[in-house]
A protein has these predicted regions:
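Detector for methionine-enriched segments
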Residues: 1-4, 37, 51, 76
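Amphipathic alpha-helical interaction modules
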Residues: 18-64
Length: 99
């Protein structure tokens, strides 16, 4: 299972989600079925990355802003609007390190 431990992991995971969301995540034969990547898990891990990038209390509003973008993107993926969802993920990527 993918582990989010650093900002570099976040960058890599954004690209991974952009490439495979919503339902094309590669099957990993060394993982159990419940540990395979899904859309929900991918976005959970993106949120973990937000916390890694902005752990300080002073950045609570930045975390909220970024999580709202992720919420919109996830909802668009769930509703089958993959192009708009991808645009929102690109927006997230562009905003993640703008202070």
């Amino acid at each position: 299972m993918f582990v989010m431990e650093s900002v570099d992991d976040l960058w890599n995971h954004i690209a991974y989600v952009l490439a495979y969301a919503p339902d094309k995540f590669p099957y990993r034969d060394f993982l159990s079925d419940e540990d395979q990547m899904t859309l929900e898990l991918a976005f959970k891990q993106l949120r973990e990355g937000v916390m890694i990038a902005y752990p300080e209390d002073s950045f609570a509003s930045k975390r909220d802003e970024l999580n709202e973008i992720l919420d919109r993107s996830l909802e668009m993926f769930r509703n089958g609007n993959e192009i708009a969802a991808g645009h929102e993920l690109n927006n997230f990527e562009g905003q993640i390190f703008k202070r």
